[in-house]
From Swiss-Prot:
Species the sequence originates in: Homo sapiens (Human)
GO BP term, pick one: glycine biosynthetic process, by transamination of glyoxylate
Cofactor(s) of this protein: pyridoxal 5'-phosphate
InterPro entries (UniProt xref): Aminotrans_3, Aminotrans_3_PPA_site, PyrdxlP-dep_Trfase, PyrdxlP-dep_Trfase_major, PyrdxlP-dep_Trfase_small
Name of the protein this chain belongs to: Alanine--glyoxylate aminotransferase 2, mitochondrial
Transmembrane segment boundaries: none
GO cellular component terms given for this protein: mitochondrial matrix; mitochondrion
GO molecular function: (R)-3-amino-2-methylpropionate-pyruvate transaminase activity; alanine-glyoxylate transaminase activity; beta-alanine:pyruvate transaminase activity; pyridoxal phosphate binding
Length: 514
């Protein structure tokens, strides 16, 4: 079904009766009490848009047994959302179904990963076909899916970014990019923003500047943080700084063609270059929009000037497109294009395979040769036939279904809707983003902008889940809701999500008033 028809066939309905229980198949039971919305006060409750998909009957482990296995055998640092974690059973496009049959609108897409929809029919068909043909060879043999995919991906990047290294995850991709930068420059120092997340491997932890991911052990040698040019929470920034339909509530007197905040943050960047690194550096990592840090956007023109400063020091510029790439931002296919810059290296993962483990590093022939001189890079699973076939299918779906255009249209529609909530509720401090990458930052009040306490954000998060909406979390104090649905999302589903947020915020304000 085309996106146009899906927009027309999914009207938003509201019910004013008692709280609605999420849909459940009558024959499903795990022997545990199920989460309902009966805890919510009697407000107008948003009703989910319809879904024409029926999930299979759940026939696996009981919920309590899952909890026992998780506690006994899985990593203790792996935590799940919600007081009662969801046991998800099946997915279809923008929808998820739990083991009890309840349906949820997925507005986080597996941490900004399921780009074209859960179990997209075309991607499924390609995967099944390749599964029956060839699973694995390693790169010591050639196979068509790898070469077909490389040609398609290279065509989407500007010259001279044409040499592709296929790997399996964003952390792997960023580690390889670090090696490339150091091999090419013969320097060690790499700069990244405070609040940046570039991976959780021992090597990339040096680039990641979020306290949750820091260890009391040495690691990430040669990595230096610099101030994040955050126009909402940083010392400078105002109402004309961001490349977004929605600006901050802070005022500024900048002329349309001159951003004073950008100039101030560039001075801080120069200070880092003067005091914290050697005279010659290896490179600079930047996400076009910070993801884990809560969808932070930089002042217009900042990255362009920062790239010039880095190159003047002999460094290369790396764009981490793990969360921003493949049309998610709407106006452009790649996030770096929104800043009018051309990186020397681009890393990508997550949406590249719609959830299948896959990643890539793309660079210039010159930098690729520098790596080849010092390292015979090899990756057993990089360029796997299954991954490449799926990657090709994802690119085809994005083009055939106009998903980049949908991200622009529906994302802008959603940003403007959420901006109205910001104006309506004192605890919504900022709404920001571009396309289908949106952040909603919660504050105690708009004057101090102190982060809303975690326990209060947790309750709003729970209330959204009880009403059938799944969203992510981000920022240093986990005070920002991250909105990044699959790019097939429709306006009626956005209307539902906004009404869920309005209901959750209203209930929270009522709790505060008691």
């Amino acid at each position: 079904m085309t996106l146009i028809w899906r927009h027309l066939l999914r009207p938003l309905c509201l019910v004013t009766s008692a709280p609605r229980i999420l849909e459940m198949h009558p024959f499903l039971s795990l022997g545990t009490s199920r989460t309902s919305v009966t805890k919510l006060s009697l407000h107008t409750k948003p009703r989910m848009p319809p879904c024409d998909f029926m999930p299979e009957r759940y026939q696996s482990l009981g919920y309590n047994r899952v909890l026992e296995i998780h506690k006994e055998h899985l990593s203790p640092v792996v935590t799940a959302y919600f007081q009662k974690p969801l046991l998800l059973h099946q997915g279809h496009m923008e929808w998820l179904f739990d083991a009890e049959g309840s349906r949820y609108l997925d507005f986080f897409s597996g941490i900004v990963t399921v780009s074209v929809g859960h179990c997209h029919p075309k991607v499924n068909a390609v995967a099944q076909k390749q599964l029956g043909r060839l699973w694995h060879t390693s790169t010591v043999f050639f196979h068509p899916p790898m070469h077909e995919y490389a040609e398609k991906l290279a065509a989407l990047l500007p010259e001279p970014l044409k040499v592709i290294f296929l790997v399996n995850s964003g952390s792997e991709a960023n580690e390889l990019a670090m090696l490339m930068a150091r091999a090419h420059s013969n320097n060690i120092d790499i700069i990244s923003f405070r609040g940046a997340y570039h991976g959780c491997s021992p090597y990339t932890l040096g680039l990641t500047n979020v306290g949750t991911y820091k260890m009391e052990l040495p690691g990430g040698t040669g990595c230096q943080p610099t101030m994040c040019p955050d126009v909402f929470r940083g010392p400078w920034g105002g109402s004309h700084c961001r490349d977004s339909p929605v600006q901050t509530i802070r005022k500024c007197s900048c002329a349309p063609d001159c951003c004073q905040a950008k100039d101030q943050y560039i001075e801080q960047f120069k200070d880092t270059l003067s005091t914290s690194v050697a005279k010659s550096i290896a490179g600079f990592f930047a996400e076009p929009i910070q993801g884990v840090n809560g969808v932070v956007q930089y002042p217009k023109g900042f990255l362009k000037e920062a790239f010039e400063l880095v190159r003047a020091r002999g460094g290369v510029c790396i764009a981490d497109e793990v969360q921003t790439g493949f049309g998610r931002l709407g106006s452009h296919f790649w996030g770096f294009q929104t800043h009018d810059v051309l990186p020397d290296i681009v890393t990508m993962a997550k949406g590249i395979g719609n959830g299948f483990p896959m990643a890539a590093v793309i660079t210039t022939p010159e930098i690729a040769k520098s790596l080849a001189k010092c390292l015979q890079h090899f990756n057993t699973f990089g360029g796997n036939p299954m991954a490449c076939a799926i990657g090709s299918a994802v690119l085809e779906v994005i083009k055939e279904e106009n998903l980049q255009e949908n991200s622009q249209e529906v994302g802008t529609y959603m940003l403007l809707k959420f901006a109205k909530l910001r104006d309506e509720f004192e605890i919504v401090g900022d709404v920001r983003g571009k396309g289908l990458m949106i952040g909603i930052e919660m504050v105690q009040d708009k004057i101090s902008c102190r982060p809303l306490p975690r326990e209060e954000v947790n309750q709003i998060h729970e209330d959204c889940k009880h009403m059938g909406l799944l969203v992510g979390r981000g920022s240093i104090f986990s005070q920002t809701f991250r909105i990044a649905p699959s790019m097939c999302i429709t306006k009626p589903e956005v209307d539902f999500a906004v009404e869920v947020f309005r209901s959750a915020l209203t209930q929270h304000m009522e709790r505060r008033a008691k």
